[in-house]
Curated annotation (Swiss-Prot):
It comes from Cavia porcellus (Guinea pig). This is Peroxisome proliferator-activated receptor alpha. Ubiquitinated by E3 ubiquitin-protein ligase HUWE1; leading to proteasomal degradation. Phosphorylated. InterPro entries: 1Cnucl_rcpt (IPR003074), NHR-like_dom_sf (IPR035500), Nucl_hrmn_rcpt_lig-bd (IPR000536), Nuclear_hormone_rcpt_NR1 (IPR050234), Nuclear_hrmn_rcpt (IPR001723), PPAR-alpha (IPR003076), Znf_hrmn_rcpt (IPR001628), Znf_NHR/GATA (IPR013088). A zinc finger (NR C4-type) spans 102-122, 139-161.
């Protein structure tokens, strides 16, 4: 069994330049509301829907704040019926609490006019038509009345007014009848439930697609790695690489295909660096296939796809690499071997600096106790990052990113209900990853300069103009 203990390390702060990341905006929003979380958990979030009261504020009768009836009301109705004014906020929320649409054209309703919710434009149109007894040219096209075209066909507009229930017999302004209020409240609640249900289904579908693509494209996931590291596999025990002798043995057995004749005679550090490159190239290929499975990615401009992968693959690689690590070392050779952290630290300069920062990051990241479903969404969010330099269709990419981050947030809340701050803590890791990749790219350039280690063409293309 390999020791699995992972010490809890303090979170590192966000760097100033990382605050420009759209993902980091979520972090700032989360941190801004953390103070309210404990209070909000105890509040009744069900609430109740209230509706505004509309008053006639013109001159003459009713200018004192009372509400008058339509001057076209039947003779049997009183000429001036007053309704008591209900102070806003006493038993109903402000008028802005619910955005009600005009039943005729869909514009924002200004009140309850002639028996229905209507905007000022349609209210005035109906009043003029009735008062002046206007007759419009007949239209058989059943025109669709919308805000942008409501003035084009007056016949169909007036017909729509009548069809939705506008009547000169109804009061012109005033409080919404209780029956209408109850009906509208029921409609709003039903609509909200339906839309929430549809949205939840869409989000679950997105999360499922990303998770399935993750499991399909990556051989070593966290579940497998943790089982191997815990020594719970029924196969042969891990071969531990802890010195030069065991390294040579592993190169002849576990890594024989990777360590070719061309590099077999080079120094140990260069051979290890070569093996790391081979793993990286394979993972980049798998990440490319994973990215294609993210809804919307394959439809992006090819240049944008390349840019997102170029800047995101190493952040994703170091994220997934954490699953194979514990405080003592990491899995190699598809989980058949284990190389100790101490052995890697004792390599000569600058090779000894290659893996230690990754171990430090992994200890903090593993302390979050994410599972593969969480990690899959986080990796997808890393790839679809709208602040990468040189992107063409930024708006579309940011919408993709926003959807994935929203799914990630909801998934974490469901998967880790007891960890209220997990989402902002995870987003903070974005800053750590960017710094980690920057330092790694700089170290690779040093290794290229100070040794005879060659860089794989694919990785060379990724590093070019990167930092």
């Amino acid at each position: 069994m390999v020791d699995m203990e992972s010490p809890l390390c303090p979170l590192s702060p966000l760097e100033a330049e990382d605050l420009e990341s759209p993902l980091s905006e979520y972090f700032l929003q989360e941190m801004g509301t953390i103070q309210d979380i404990s209070r909000s958990l105890g509040e009744d979030s069900s609430g109740s829907f209230g509706f505004p009261e509309y008053q006639y504020l013109g001159s003459g009768p009713g200018s004192d704040g009372s509400v008058i009836t339509d001057t076209l009301s039947p003779a049997s109705s009183p000429s001036s019926v007053s309704y008591p004014e209900v102070p806003c906020g006493v038993d109903e929320p402000p008028s802005s609490a619910l955005n009600i649409e005009c039943r005729i054209c869909g514009d924002k309703a200004s009140g309850y006019h002639y028996g229905v919710h209507a905007c000022e434009g349609c209210k005035g149109f109906f009043r003029r038509t009735i008062r002046l007894k206007l007759v419009y040219d007949k239209c058989d096209r059943s025109c669709k009345i919308q805000k942008k075209n409501r003035n084009k066909c007056q016949y169909c507009r007036f017909h729509k007014c009548l069809s939705v229930g506008m009547s000169h017999n109804a009061i012109r302004f005033g409080r919404m009848p209780r029956s209408e209020k109850a009906k509208l409240k029921a409609e709003v609640l039903t609509c909200d439930r339906d839309s929430e249900g549809a949205e939840t289904a869409d989000l679950k579908s997105l999360a499922k697609r990303i998770y399935e693509a993750y499991l399909k494209n990556f051989h070593m996931n966290k579940v497998k790695a943790r089982i191997i590291l815990a020594g719970k596999t029924s196969s042969h025990p891990l071969f531990v690489i802890h010195d030069m002798e065991t390294l040579c043995t592993a190169e002849k057995t576990l890594m024989a295909k990777v360590v070719s004749d061309g590099i077999r005679d080079k120094e140990a550090e260069v051979r290890i660096f070569h093996c790391c490159q081979c793993v990286s190239v394979e993972t980049v290929t798998n990440l490319t296939e994973f990215a294609k499975a993210i809804p919307g990615f394959a439809s992006l401009d090819l240049n944008d796809q390349v840019t997102l992968l170029k800047y995101g693959v190493y952040e994703a690689i170091f994220t997934m690499l954490s699953s194979t690590m514990n405080k003592d070392g990491m899995l190699v050779a598809y989980g058949h071997g284990f190389i100790t952290r101490e052995f890697l630290k004792n390599l000569r300069k600058p090779f000894c600096d290659m893996m230690e920062p990754k171990f430090n990051f992994a200890m903090k990241f593993n302390a979050l106790e994410l599972d593969d479903s969480d990690i899959s969404l986080f990796v997808a969010a890393i790839i679809c990052c709208g602040d990468r330099p040189g992107l063409l269709n930024i708006d579309h990419i940011e919408k993709m990113q926003e959807a994935i981050v929203h799914v990630l947030k909801l998934h974490l809340q469901s998967n880790h209900p007891d960890d209220t701050f997990l989402f902002p803590k995870l987003l903070q890791k974005l800053a750590d990853l960017r710094q980690l990749v920057t330092e790694h790219a700089q170290l690779v350039q040093v290794i290229k300069t100070e040794s005879d280690a060659a860089l794989h063409p694919l990785l060379q293309e990724i590093y070019r103009d990167m930092y």
